[in-house]
Amino acid sequence: MSEITSTDARAQPEKKDFIRQIIREDLAHGTHTHIRTRFPPEPNGYLHIGHAKAICLDFGVAAEFGGHCTLRMDDTNPSKEDPAFAAAIQDDVSWLGFHWNALRHTSDYFEVLYLAAEKLITDGKAYVCDLNSEQVREYRGTLTEAGRPSPWRERSPDENLELFRQMRAGTFPDGTRTLRAKIDMASGNINLRDPALYRIKHVEHQNTGNTWPIYPMYDFAHALSDAIEGITHSLCTLEFEDHRPLYDWCVNHVDLPNNSHLLKPLLDKGFPQEPSQPRQIEFSRLNINYTVMSKRKLTALVDEKLVEGWDDPRMYTLQGLRRRGYTPAAMRLFVERIGISKQNSIIDFSVLENCLRENLDTIAPRRMATIAPLKLVLTNLPEDHEEQLIFPNHPKDDTQGTRTMPFSRELWIERDDFSEIPPKGWKRLVPGGEVRLRGAGIARVDEVVKNAAGDIIALHGWLDPTSRPGMEGAHRKVKGTIHWVSAPHAVAAEIRLYDRLFSVEKPDDNTDGKTYRDVLNPDSKRVVHGYIEPAAAQTAPEHAFQFERLGYFVTDRHDHDAAHPVFNRSVTLRDTWQRD
């Protein structure tokens, strides 16, 4: 697994976004001597491109400042979580090129969180409430009206402690009681109106089994897990800005650094005891046009079979982007290019595509392929003519070496490279016209062969024998150059032409009554059967090529093999989407 280390990061130009400036100041003032961050996904789905920004920031910051980053599975909602999602998350983080200092689960800390909740009860800072969820919403109030205190808000600490322990013992059914923080029902911040800290949920947990009939709420568990792990800077997106006062309330009132007895369960697990007073810092989330990133909507796309699974190359999951042919380097370049700020904005999808083009232009070997093949027969060559031509694997990188490519009397060319009635400015083949065959010589079309329906099925032509490589006529000027594949040697391949999943910039915009389902791009996937040169077929899955003049393609991660090649188009050679 490739890693982004501190050494790698420091070789890069210094980044000066506001988060890194805060960290530099904290280090300079002695607030912290060692930086610790975390990436805390919930294992209830696959990571998407928005998570890539958080991953690059969390792990990148730690590496740049010589610290470390923890990968924590936020597994507090077992009814929606699955070990398969947890495994995919680890795979995605590794694929992006990052290595976690430790792998943790919020469930590792359930005993500590329970003891912390008992402390809050004893301190008079939490109470057991008998209101159901609908009543809680009613009592909470609105943005313009203060909330009302629960009838059970003034229970004594002893009664609350007894009830909470009964909740822990599994005495009560789901939804009948919650443990709530006692903060301020009149607060202008609704998150501080006595939020729930624990709820009853008799659900088996993937890691703890049936040990726990109660589970901590996100805000409580997240804040204290950061504190338990000694996190110095808890980086999250802007929608959590209003949750920061609650985050600080949990951290400060439990006060783990000064209540080390609460950490005793960590000793049994062999975990370090390095509690901190973490600081939450918010940054803008990643928004890209032509996409949806809501987990609910992505799930609907899969469940309704509008796409072919979570790793469909049209999906914006990291699994899907990887299968499409996006590289870790391109993803990291994209995150670096869009930067880190507090201002929400929508990034044009072309920025992501250009990062991939830039990366693949440097690393992808060149190959020839035809996706809409048309046969060209060079009638002045012998029927058994065969020779091996030498081509560079990359025109700008001699270190990638060369390959041999067979050349024969019958070739496959691209159907779009011939026109009987050419438009103005046409530079490719026409009846009686000439074109250069890449690396092979200059050819002319003498005859257009059609079937009974009038469809063109072949071209017959002539290869100028004086224009072969190394001959003087090879320098003769012609207007166009086209690619080709030797027909007897070509390998048939399935080629999947992927494009953007949605046809409009804002698929989430329902102002015209249409939902994201109504604006799916009908041409987001086309499957064609073409021909590739032999050197392209004999390669492993997830290997990228530039098919000359066609775009960047990758061997499919799951379906490709040498006997039955399958290629996915990762991105076109240039941006073909017209902006409004």
From Swiss-Prot:
Keyword tags: Aminoacyl-tRNA synthetase, ATP-binding, Cytoplasm, Ligase, Nucleotide-binding, Protein biosynthesis
Enzyme class: ligase
Reaction(s) this enzyme catalyzes, per UniProt: tRNA(Gln) + L-glutamine + ATP = L-glutaminyl-tRNA(Gln) + AMP + diphosphate
Gene Ontology cellular component terms for the protein in this record: cytosol
Record GO biological process: glutaminyl-tRNA aminoacylation; glutamyl-tRNA aminoacylation
A GO term, aspect molecular function: glutamine-tRNA ligase activity
EC id: 6.1.1.18
Superkingdom to which the source organism belongs: Bacteria
Residues reported in the UniProt entry to bind L-glutamine: 74, 218
Similarity section: Belongs to the class-I aminoacyl-tRNA synthetase family.
Protein name in the entry: Glutamine--tRNA ligase
Organism: Xylella fastidiosa (strain 9a5c)
Gene: glnS
